[in-house]
Amino acid sequence: MYGNDNWINSYLDAILDAGKGAAASASASAVGGGGGAGDRPSLLLRERGHFSPARYFVEEVITGYDETDLYKTWLRANAMRSPQEKNTRLENMTWRIWNLARKKKELEKEEANRLLKRRLETERPRVETTSDMSEDLFEGEKGEDAGDPSVAYGDSTTGNTPRISSVDKLYIVLISLHGLVRGENMELGRDSDTGGQVKYVVELAKALSSCPGVYRVDLFTRQILAPNFDRSYGEPVEPLASTSFKNFKQERGENSGAYIIRIPFGPKDKYLAKEHLWPFIQEFVDGALSHIVKMSRAIGEEISCGHPAWPAVIHGHYASAGVAAALLSGALNVPMVFTGHFLGKDKLEELLKQGRQTREQINMTYKIMCRIEAEELALDASEIVIASTRQEIEEQWNLYDGFEVILARKLRARVKRGANCYGRYMPRMVIIPPGVEFGHMIHDFDMDGEEDGPSPASEDPSIWSEIMRFFTNPRKPMILAVARPYPEKNITTLVKAFGECRPLRELANLTLIMGNREAISKMHNMSAAVLTSVLTLIDEYDLYGQVAYPKRHKHSEVPDIYRLAVRTKGAFVNVPYFEQFGVTLIEAAMHGLPVIATKNGAPVEIHQVLDNGLLVDPHDQHAIADALYKLLSEKQLWSKCRENGLKNIHQFSWPEHCKNYLSRISTLGPRHPAFASNEDRIKAPIKGRKHVTVIAVDSVSKEDLIRIVRNSIEAARKENLSGSTGFVLSTSLTIGEIHSLLMSAGMLPTDFDAFICNSGSDLYYPSCTGDTPSNSRVTFALDRSYQSHIEYHWGGEGLRKYLVKWASSVVERRGRIEKQVIFEDPEHSSTYCLAFKVVNPNHLPPLKELQKLMRIQSLRCHALYNHGATRLSVIPIHASRSKALRYLSVRWGIELQNVVVLVGETGDSDYEELFGGLHKTVILKGEFNTSANRIHSVRRYPLQDVVALDSPNIIGIEGYGTDDMRSALKQLDIRAQ
């Protein structure tokens, strides 16, 4: 056997040649617009001329494995010195791969069963929900729903949709936290976080600020002061040059226009990837909140006679910015809009299907559970969710607990006719394709594709020579791909399609614009692996002189690269496994360049509008090669695709995008801080405090809580802070329980400036009825503005009825006897807090299961366990102790940097929310803390994924004595002013 290893080598060669997920079809046909192959056989099969059993084996069995990994294994095997040892290693490797493939099929079967089970679990309560409402549907409503997309998602542009006029002066807030964001010379492709989204949000900000009726646009991102990054990323404010739209003119003021606002959060000397931003988002929110409040008042002075001009919308881009937008929306009571860009559940399913990592490993790498929960929270808080395609809504968002197409359709229909939705709500899904900037459009050809004579004085752009130097024959049509070097972009399949098809190689050149790079050895592992694989394939197929892969290009040179492809009558190719937006396809069409695009995602709907190319299966390299050959070899087809693209591209312009965008937000009801109109109705001493101490300790007895309060007040007095320091009690207790607690301790309500009760659903201030405070003369004043602030989509009675029904189903089973363990607790309930008593905490369902159930039912609320898991509280989605503190900050002008929050070692299920932000946090450690209970052992993700416990703003002290408190104040540099 060792003397004849040809069979082994044939399998190894096949492994190297087989593409990821290669189809075993005999002919490769492109999809859409003529397809590409027609009835003729594949060029690759004609060229091959014979059937290879080894290749068939690999293409049928070895799917889903990265060729780079297999190639590295083959290199290691060939490095063996002894021929006998080498052959043995080769043989073992081949059979090991076969065994892995069999295991992978078993895993795929298990995964399919898991997905089926999850789908059934999700559909059951949704079926119950729709059946509950179906009895109230008008006759014929179901038929109306089925065919009308506007009923399904609320995305119709027809009817009496109000428009933004030049009289309106809107303030719009955009948020995009990750990557390197600046207005000029964008470093797109420098890393995995600096890509199309960065370009999109910057251009959106510029375009919106140029629209009539829009006064100011702020694009918030992270301030980056890390070494090796340009100083521009550390500038707090960067003005953006507005896009010039024809006939769009309006009067401007000092604070008008578009700006990038950079907020410092997280480690100041480090650049953080998006997966590591989660613990610092609340810190960003606090910084952004301060800026928005100041800017709203400044704009108000210019345009509103002194009344604050609060944001019309706060628009989050990507999951992390979705959380930030939700928190800011809740703090300011203004509408939220969300764009997901690339959704976490879709990525998770894709990674699980590959079978290389477990769910735990995926979460460790990508923090995927934080991302998915953030997207669910964005669904809870958003008025509008913007998608680029219908496929994104029906196939991606439909995976989430908080959205379901059929239920959304029914709820939209009920809202239209004013019917009762029983407290249920779903955000409006609207489809607005991305826009492109037409400012750099230069056509060197007429509509028939004939070259216009260039000006004698004009010079070719320098990037052209940088690309042309790679080619032996630069006059051939140029196939252009613009994509970052990541596995999902599928660049290696494109290179293999080009390399294996000799007629295509003879016809055209290939140009790969894969971002900017220095040395491959210094790149991110995934990017380096893709680039190494590309270079290996170029060498394997001997593509020297036929493939260009420049190391650097400027963002401003990208239009020139498109023009070069048009000049050579080439084509643009974009074949990732899935394309969320497809901005590069629109840019190519804008320059008159026909396209070959993936059939998965946004390109399908872009193609329906533009009809300027062919769609292909990104897994099928034969189809890619055939489509490219067809497009480049048939002159009439090329000219028709070019003409169609130029004729229809106006539908993807920024003016069109902004017109649709502004028409959507004009339908949103006006929401703004309720206290703006009745600022003086409550006289609260907290308004004049220099420092505020918030006591939010849940893990101690009532006796220890009283001692902590007393010692905190005494510590402030001894540090000469008593007159300038206010105290806030933040707890899950009701106001009645708080009053009883203070009475038993001999304390006065006036010892505090405010009381955050019922886990943040109620806010009270002490109110004196006489000149001398006493227990008999002190009452509590309810902040009704706060109630208006948090009532957004509160389910009310409909939510209560559903929770009562759910509570009756939670039982403890002892043999044949079932005993209910959760009961409604009217005594501890209030208007915005539904309380339930827990008889046996050991039988509590995990909180994430209850939250999942509420979302499936479209009941938007915040559920939490408190009192050592003996009480369940369900409150509005924008209510919490943390959010109540931000409300106090905005209403009474409290600087969060001067706030100290006291917490225990454990607490209620909202414990993690009390850490993050600009305020200081003191953890009281010691045996007086109750042990952690079950509510913290079933988290969606580890605490350290969302809390930066090593932050300088968080300290721990042993004990809670007066001296301990004073030591903490000194450590935090809290001093008398």
From Swiss-Prot:
Region Disordered, residue ranges: 124-159
Keywords carried by this UniProt record: Glycosyltransferase, Transferase
Gene3D superfamilies attached to this UniProt entry: Glycogen Phosphorylase B (3.40.50.2000)
Induction of synthesis: Circadian-regulated, with the highest expression 3 hours after the beginning of light period (in 14 hours light/10 hours dark cycle).
Top-level EC class: transferase
Pathway the protein takes part in: Glycan biosynthesis; sucrose biosynthesis; sucrose from D-fructose 6-phosphate and UDP-alpha-D-glucose: step 1/2
GO biological process, one term: sucrose biosynthetic process
Activity control summary: Activity is regulated by phosphorylation and moderated by concentration of metabolites and light.
Catalyses which reaction(s): beta-D-fructose 6-phosphate + UDP-alpha-D-glucose = sucrose 6(F)-phosphate + UDP + H(+)
Lineage: superkingdom: Eukaryota
GO function term, MF aspect, one: sucrose-phosphate synthase activity
Summary of the tissues where the protein is detected: Expressed in germinating seeds.
EC number(s) stated in the UniProt entry for this protein: 2.4.1.14
Family designation: Belongs to the glycosyltransferase 1 family.
Protein role: Plays a role in photosynthetic sucrose synthesis by catalyzing the rate-limiting step of sucrose biosynthesis from UDP-glucose and fructose- 6-phosphate. Involved in the regulation of carbon partitioning in the leaves of plants. May regulate the synthesis of sucrose and therefore play a major role as a limiting factor in the export of photoassimilates out of the leaf. Plays a role for sucrose availability that is essential for plant growth and fiber elongation.
Subunit structure comment from the entry: Homodimer or homotetramer.
Protein name per Swiss-Prot or TrEMBL: Probable sucrose-phosphate synthase 3
Organism: Oryza sativa subsp. japonica (Rice)
Source organism phylogeny: Eukaryota, Viridiplantae, Streptophyta, Embryophyta, Tracheophyta
